[in-house]
């Protein structure tokens, strides 16, 4: 009966007709099998070089990850989180691409220009957050850091302040470098 119902070989035509006749007489209708639905798998990779920028901005980074998680749930995407240390990043990315997700969002706050070639190791679409990556086929989402700092300096100047200082990380962070450039440009 199973061979007939699943339209398999190994059953004579006469037996096949008799089985189908009984099936129709009894009004049997096979249950529709649910097809396994492939879910979109998204990975969030948090790139860590020195940890200072990530640690000092935990609330900001957590809010980004929370929102990504919320949207993945809303669209029934599977979300995979991965921490990636700069010194082992190449091996980590190569290993991840053995069973690649459908897309990757890189928290790139601590990515520096020498790290950019690592992004080419991804074999799936990539978006970098919190770093203005200028690299072929890599999109990024970042604040307008220079304009932001220029606006702050301009605002303080309009309030009457003439000696405006700037604090920045001792470790290199692209966002901070861009903000510093905006600060210096507005002071001129």
Predicted regions and their residues:
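N-terminal helix-turn-helix DNA-binding module of bacterial transcription factors
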Residues: 2-39
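Alpha-helical structural signal in soluble globular domains
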Residues: 22, 67-71, 118, 178-188
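A short, charged/proline- and glycine-enriched loop
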Residues: 37-42, 160
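Alpha-helical recognition/docking segments in bacterial nutrient-uptake
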Residues: 40-154
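An alpha-beta-alpha
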Residues: 152-187
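Surface-exposed alpha-helical interface segments used for non-catalytic interactions
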Residues: 13, 17, 66, 154, ...
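Short acidic/polar active-site loop segments enriched in Thr and Asp
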Residues: 29, 102, 161-163
